[in-house]
Amino acid sequence: ETVTITGAEPWHSYTVNFLAVRLWEEISMYNHITNDWGDKEHLMAVDPRYPETQAHMIEWMTEWCEKNPDTTVVRFTSMFYNFAWFWKDDKNCRDAFSDWGSYAMTTTPLALKEFEKKYGYAMTSEDFVNAGLYTSTHNVPSKKYRAWMDFINEFVVSFGKKLIDIVHSYGKKAYVFYDDSWIGVEPYSKRFKEFGFDGLIKCVFNGFEARLCAGVDGVTHELRFHPYLFPTGLTGEPTFAPGGNPKLDASRYWVNVRRALLRLSLIHI
């Protein structure tokens, strides 16, 4: 379809908002595009709000625990919703758009309807697009957006706890990764302790991210240092690819993190 913008002024940028279904889950997309996953199946995101999806996830979690009796710690990576992250084929500019604090990927038709039923008003696309500023962590959220965050957080905790309880019932500990699909987990929210997680893991580029992990109460803290053992680093550097320098990358990240380590309560690195 065609959208016509009227009254446009020179040198101004305009956005057209729309709701789309993403068929290709973005972590799978990232690894295929940057790390050449080849014939590995393209994964699709699921909507955990539907009873059928929840039943499948509970069955899968139970079956996994049954088949892996020797595993003592289960890492959730992380819960159900990822931040906004899009990749493209251009080798000179892989990252199309990323917003680590964005709740845009939580906007399914069912969630929007349930929110309106609970709060008495509807979210609009502009509440998420925010005049093109979007909703990254350095932007103060609106009252409506904070209500949406609370709405999602309540659901993620209530259903997520069921999966964690399954892990605990098999005598295993449950850790959560404070990165991929972390949206709705909100480790600094008042509800986080209701999950029952035993530990929190975070991959870190710098001291700020190290403190972000260590500041969460009631869990074991674990840092995961960069670079990852992938050909391409998360910021596009060819760490383990031809022309890369993993020693230099590791040294740079270590320098950025080490001062913060002196003041943190950490158990694992």
Question: Which sequence ranges carry the predicted segments?
Answer:
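Polysaccharide-binding and catalytic clefts of secreted carbohydrate-active enzymes
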Residues: 1-194, 212
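Conserved small/polar residues in nucleotide/adenosyl-binding loops
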Residues: 268-269
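ATP/nucleotide-binding catalytic cores
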Residues: 72, 172, 248, 254, ...
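Short, low-complexity, polybasic intrinsically disordered segments
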Residues: 195, 199-200
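An N-terminal assembly and electron-transfer interface module characteristic of large anaerobic redox
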Residues: 89, 99, 243-250, 256-260
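Structural motif
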Residues: 77-78, 177-181, 202-206, 225-228
